[in-house]
Amino acid sequence: MAGFQSSEVDPNTKNKNAEEMFNELNKVPFFMQSLEDVGDESENNVQLDALKALAYEGEPHEVAQNFREHGNECFASKRYKDAEEFYTKALAQKCGDKDIEIACYSNRAACNLLFENYRQVLNDCAQVLQRDSTHAKAYYRSAKALVALKRYDEAKECIRLCSLVHPNDPAILALSKELQKKSDDFEKRESEKKRVAQEKVIAAKTVLLALQERHIKTKTTEHPPDLGDAMISLSTFDDPKSELFFPTILLYPLVYQSDFVPSVSENCTPLELLKTVFQSPAPWDVHQLYNPDSLDVFATTDTLGLIKVGKNVPILKALTHPKVTLIDGLVQLHVVPHHLASDWISSWKKNKQENAKN
């Protein structure tokens, strides 16, 4: 074709996608979208230095407007980080042009809304509203950020002010609906939290009253065991006369084993508890000595002595024994095969005497 010279197309170009082509063009000064992120190869590029100088040439409002326009171009092409940087550079000029500053603060808020930098969104929108108290987008973006931060009352006020300017705007109506739902859900959760917290306080006081009414002595040590969620409880949390339940540990001292039962009724007997625990033989009971009917149960006294607990009487009876104290809210019962109980008791007494000497 007249006036044009043919040239060979770089074969590597065919294998490049759009993003790679854009990155290549961005290294050419004329096409650059950012004058900062240019790589080492451009350090001595005279054309680039000239372009950098041009970017800041002119009156402050002209420089700011130039950066603003670059920001708008980047935003339109969804390069939000670059857009945010250009708006920041525009604002750094402090040009004093109200319209430019409003646009840059507002658009930077839009970028930060996408980045979920909600506090920066609020800061930028506040700058907009200082310059224009009727700026609908500033109220809208503030509301979006406040919803994300769960500051629902403030968000409602922003939407109200925004609606005064654009009462039928679909985005505002949708945000208002979203806010109402989230606000209602939040209030329900907070109400439930308060209810649960109040019940816990009432339950704790009622448990203390229930223990007192049953004449059960209690003691809390400096380092109580971690029982997880298990605790003394009542079948009706605010009724001290309702059924009382205790975390209970069964200790098998002859085999150094134990079973923890999170909740045992005060009316449960040791035999009933043992039958529940030993429904299936324990893997450590290789000699099958732990048959509920052939086991003896003991509780410790305040002086570290032992009392035998009847297997067919409620556990409450052991807890109300004048020499027994409920320690750290945990019922502790020692379980020993009947034919070995005598020797174990002798060993217990011997250890107690030796500890007393020391």
Curated annotation (Swiss-Prot):
Subcellular location: Cytoplasm; Nucleus
Signal sequence bounds: none
Biological role stated in the UniProt entry: Co-chaperone that binds to the molecular chaperones Hsp90 and Hsp70. Stimulates Hsp70 ATPase activity, but not Hsp90 ATPase activity. Involved in only a subset of Hsp90 functions.
SMART domains cross-referenced by the UniProt entry: TPR
Keyword match DNA repair: no
Keywords: Chaperone, Cytoplasm, Nucleus, Repeat, TPR repeat
Main localisation: cytoplasm
CDD domains noted in UniProt: CTWD_TTC4
Name listed for the protein in its UniProt record: Hsp70/Hsp90 co-chaperone cns1
Keyword Transmembrane helix annotated: no
Family: Belongs to the TTC4 family.
Pfam family, one: Wheel
Molecular function via GO: Hsp70 protein binding; Hsp90 protein binding
Intervals holding TPR repeats: 64-97, 102-135, 136-169, 221-255
GO CC annotation, single: cytosol
Disulphide bonds in the chain: none
Subunit description: Monomer. Component of Hsp70 and Hsp90 chaperone complexes.
GO biological process, one term: protein folding
